Amino acid sequence: MTRREMKILVEVSHTSGHDVRTGIQAVVRGLLSGLRLARMNFQTVRWSRWRNAFVPLDRYRNQALGISDLSERDRCPNEIDRVWLLLPEVIYGPKLLRMIAYARQQRMRIAAIFHDAIPVTHPELVRREARKFHSAYMTALGDVDLIVAVSDSAAEQFRLYHEKRLGRVPTIYVCPSSGELAGEERAAAKPNAIPDTVNILCVSTLEPRKNHQTLLQAFELASSVVSHPKLYLHLVGDRYKDADHIVELVLAATRRNPNIAWYGKITDHRLIRLYRESDFTIYPSTIEGFGLAISQSLWNRRPCICANYGAMAEIAKDGGCLTVDVGDAAKLSDAIVALATSLDLRQKLAKEIDNRPLKTWQVYATEICRQFEAVD
């Protein structure tokens, strides 16, 4: 099947209506950028409760998603033999069932990007809404034609969930996300010189599983044993619902130590500046479906400290990362000290980054569309 014979409807109600910067929203924006660059026939849509149907996004919402330059040819191809509905967001409540039912009535194929099963496997780490609705969300996805899992770990969690409860498992295709910041130039490698200061960047929403408490403890330990170079920790990430205690924890740390800064939610343009200024990154999350911040760090040629297990280890295995037990503050501190004080180690990891394959969002989108054709 050629591209002209297939049209993709991408349901992006949440991302198009909210100025949020979570990993899922980054994937949505990157996916749309990739579809546009690959010149796929696609249209962004949202679900209308009043019409009980999908409606195209207006120019304002498309502009907010960075795809306002879609041509009419891209949006409205003349001849379509097959329509795919692509669900890249997590959708809670009865709306998802209505979407799937409508798509079936219209004889559409349905694909969903599956990010993680964390609210089911670790309900204590997520907000109340996710604890309440994520299981029903995963159950509903059992009726789609194709699951695009962000990692082998996410694919296995989805498979186990459906084998235990329903018996039937849709086709699952693993397609890790890109770390590219769409529209932003990739950061250059750091100069090979011993700096007087080392800037450490952590990009992560302030939620329980991201493990900020251990990170702050580890940074204090590392700072106490390293007098030169001077260590600075830069935290980027929005607040998380039902986790105000983590915000207070971070704010208290910034008051105690002027070398710790929290920037909250920022634009991609400012984020790329922080990547350029950083010497390495740290992603202390204890559990992930994928770990987009690790991939972003590698894309921007910055070594990353991350967990030595799960989805994080999947990304790290091809090089550029220093893996460690992120639940142990002493071991995490040792990793910080090692990267901060050893230019040779940072250069070794930087070379591994340049030698490993890194996909763009265009490659990511093309890979998914090829899988649509394979399923058809």
Whereabouts are the PLM-identified features?
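Carbohydrate transferase catalytic cores enriched for Leloir-type hexosyltransferases
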Residues: M1-D376
